[in-house]
Amino acid sequence: GQYWRDLFDSRASTRRNALRGVFRYYELLAPIFDEEDIIYLGEGLTPIIEASDFMKEKVGIPFAFKNDGQNPSASFKDRGMACAFSYLKWLCRRHQWDEVLTVCASTGDTSAAAALYASYVGAPLKRVALLPHGKVTPQQLPQPPGSGATVLELPGVFDDCMKVVEHLAENYRVALLNSKNSWRILGQESYAYEVAQWYGWDVSGLCIFVPIGNAGNITAVMSGFLKMLEL
């Protein structure tokens, strides 16, 4: 209710990095973390831009778009990675792990985001991205190695890479960073909270379209709105 609206609104001007970005909604995402575990790279709080008259005419309806391309690695995946890697940092500190391998299958965005956030955790994380050979754009291919990740290109498609990642996660101390990781979904719930806050906590009458991919993102957004309904 009003308590939560006031709390989240009050954080709009905070200078504490740990409670900026997606962690403005800390209590809804990851209340087990200490502030020292939270990784903030400027993700989240992206603007909602009204479409131009030309775009509205082409689509046939008035609409606006949330520009998540302004996130650090240029995609909405950064929301989930901020949460997932903050959790990993917390786990490593709590259990004093000296080495954890992070791995993901990707056609571009996921590997870029995972490598970037892993680089800010540093040791004990090692990072590997599995990409389908020839299926990643030239613009996205340099992003993971640019953040220090090892990139392995495998024959086949994304699903073939994902099978390898799942096998590794099931049999070794490996952190899977695809959307099967529930901490990824929690971080991406922030999309829903930001939309609601942007519109003064009243989203009645709005229809929201989101990138779907393998449905992890739409699951996160729906979960976020359902949580808000309960509050």
Show where each model-derived region lies.
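PLP-dependent amino-acid enzyme catalytic core
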Residues: 1-231
